[in-house]
Structures are given as structure tokens and as C-alpha cells.
Swiss-Prot record:
Protein name: Phenylalanine--tRNA ligase alpha subunit
Broad class of where this protein is predominantly found: cytoplasm
Cofactor note: Binds 2 magnesium ions per tetramer.
Known EC number: 6.1.1.20
Keyword terms, alphabetized: Aminoacyl-tRNA synthetase, ATP-binding, Cytoplasm, Ligase, Magnesium, Metal-binding, Nucleotide-binding, Protein biosynthesis
Superkingdom of source: Bacteria
Length: 325
């Protein structure tokens, strides 16, 4: 194959190249190590010595010409690809906007945040603590003796003999009192764990517990705080009542009910005056300081607020249910 034939073939084929893949095939065929132009140069040794300079010059000129045409074609293809890419990215700003799908808060989270807002507006700080607790913080410091049913392994998730998943957020109150001097007013929201699962109980649920320590606090202060909370959470006509109960960390202790129109009296939380033994465990003088504490299940409040009858709906991840609140 002579130089003129290769030149003619290269020009004709290059004109037909329309994409990067075809361009690469052309490069290999004509400019590659085993390409046709390279083969022409290798043929130089077969020519008589007097013909070699002119032939070599002609082949080099052909290579330069084909390389130049190749570069021009490559640039054309790259520009074409860039135009196509830009065309795909073109935005018609005259078109109407498209609404983006967004999620929304889980009903339990919404109620948790509402509870926090209510108590923060009443002067309480929000404090959090670890979900894996020592038995001392979870039970002993809260005046809960070893024989108490709450400490049974059938009711609590133990990790070791001394560590467990907290059964309430009251340990946060202990940690706070160990770190701060009174007076204090805190709430401690978070996850808690108990071995229970039915229509009204979950093995993992959410609590908000509160503690207020100051001089000369009484049940009257506790009742006022809970009345204010009930009115803000359930409406200005909500009423509460306190029924005697027992908790190892408060004395006296109460179950607190709220009266809701259409439902009657419904239990919403437990509360009481802090037991002096709890103060002694954290280094507070019970002769100088008094305090009240309360705790509520957020799922329970959510069920009452939204009229939900089965607590398990909160964890079934049914979008139809969750999107209703």
C-alpha cells in the first residue's frame, strides 16, 4: 500500500467518524504502533537508498497531516459532547416549580418536643444522660432496694450485674444533683427500656422526668406545675387530680390523672416529693432542701392527645398511620 492510497483512505474514514469510539478506532488503525502509517515507515528499509529520503519525508508529512486532522476531529467531537451535556442541563425557568417530597416529625417526637417547650417556658433546663446505666444510678441512689420488683432481671435489660439499659430517666436527675448545687429545675427526656410488650407497653419507649429542688417546696408547688402542664398540653379546660401511690424515690407519692372531655379521668404520670434518702445519696441536706419530681411516658401522652388505642402503632412504620399526625 503506497502513501497516496493510505492518505486518501485516512481522510475518507476520518470524515465519517462521528463519536469518540470511532475516533479511537481510527487512531489505532492509522496512528497506532501497528497502524498503517507506521507500517509505511517500516517499509523504508525495503527501498533503494536513493529513494529513502523522499519517501521518508512524504510519510512524515502524511503523519503530521493525519495527526492534525485527528486533533481537529477530536476537538469537534468534544465540543459536540459538551453541547449535548449542556443541553441536558438546560433549565426552563418559565416552567412552574416542583414540590419536593419531605418527611415530617413522628407523633411521639412532636409530643416530646411540645413537652420540652412547655417546661422550658416554665424555667426548667433540659438535661440528658446515658442510656446504659449503673445499678447505683438507676436503683440504689433512687432509694430502690434490691428486693424491689423493678430490679428483677425479668423486668429489666441487664448487660452485666452492675450495668443495664436504664428503666427510667431518673438517673439523669441523680447525675445532675451530683454535679450541681441546688436550686435546680430540670427535665430529662429520653429512651428507656423495660421487658414489656403489649397494646399499652413497649420494650423501648420515651419518658420525660422532671425535678425541682429548692427551699420550702411543697405538694402545692408540684400540683401547680402539673396543672399548668396539663392545660398547655390538653387545653385550658383540662383538670388534674392526685391519687396516693407508692414510688421508692418520692414520699408522698401520687398517680396523676387528667380529666379530658369525652374520656373522663385518665392516668398520665407519676409524681411526688423527693424522698430525703435520695437527697442524702447525692449530698444534699434534706433539712435545708426540698423538691418534687414527676415522670411521664411520652407514648402515653401521645395516645391521649391523638386518640390512639394501640401503642404498637408507633413502631410499625405504617406510613398511612404516621402521615395522619
Amino acid at each position: 500500500m503506497d502513501v497516496e492510497t493510505v492518505e486518501k483512505e485516512a481522510i475518507e474514514k476520518l470524515e465519517k467518524v462521528s463519536n469518540a469510539q470511532e475516533l479511537e478506532q481510527f487512531r489505532v488503525e492509522f496512528l497506532g504502533k501497528k497502524g498503517k502509517i507506521t507500517s509505511l515507515m517500516k517499509n523504508l528499509k525495503n527501498l533503494p537508498p536513493e529513494e529513502r529520503p523522499a519517501y521518508g519525508k512524504r510519510v512524515n508529512e502524511l503523519r503530521e497531516k493525519v495527526e492534525r486532522l485527528f486533533s481537529e476531529k477530536k476537538k469537534q467531537i468534544e465540543e459536540l459532547l459538551e453541547r449535548e451535556r449542556m443541553e441536558k442541563m438546560r433549565v426552563d425557568v418559565t416552567l412552574p416549580g416542583a414540590r419536593r417530597k419531605v418527611g415530617h416529625s413522628h407523633p411521639v417526637l412532636k409530643v416530646m418536643e411540645e413537652i420540652e417547650r412547655i417546661f422550658v417556658s416554665m424555667g426548667f433546663d433540659v438535661v440528658e444522660g446515658p442510656e446504659i446505666e449503673t445499678t447505683w444510678h438507676n436503683f440504689d441512689a433512687l432509694n430502690t432496694p434490691e428486693w424491689h420488683p423493678a430490679r428483677d432481671e425479668h423486668d429489666s435489660f441487664y448487660i452485666t450485674d452492675e450495668l443495664l439499659l436504664r428503666t427510667h430517666t431518673s438517673p439523669v436527675q441523680i447525675r445532675t444533683m451530683l454535679e450541681r448545687k441546688p436550686p435546680i429545675a430540670i427535665i430529662s427526656p429520653g429512651k428507656v427500656y423495660r421487658r414489656d410488650y403489649d397494646a399499652t407497653h413497649l420494650p423501648m419507649f420515651h419518658q420525660v422526668e422532671g425535678l425541682h429542688v429548692d427551699r420550702d417546696l411543697s405538694v402545692a408547688h408540684l400540683k401547680f406545675t402539673l396543672e399548668e402542664f396539663a392545660r398547655r398540653m390538653f387545653g385550658k379546660n383540662a383538670r388534674i387530680r392526685l391519687r396516693p401511690s407508692y414510688f421508692p424515690f418520692t414520699e408522698p407519692s401520687f398517680e396523676v390523672d387528667v380529666y379530658l372531655s369525652g374520656y373522663g379521668w385518665l392516668e398520665i404520670l407519676g409524681a411526688g416529693m423527693v424522698d430525703p434518702n435520695v437527697f442524702l445519696n447525692v449530698g444534699y441536706d434534706p433539712e435545708e432542701w426540698t423538691g418534687y419530681a414527676f415522670g411521664m411516658g411520652v407514648e402515653r401522652i401521645s395516645m391521649l392527645k391523638y386518640g390512639i388505642t394501640d401503642i404498637r402503632e408507633f413502631v410499625r412504620n405504617d406510613v398511612r398511620f404516621l402521615s395522619s399526625y
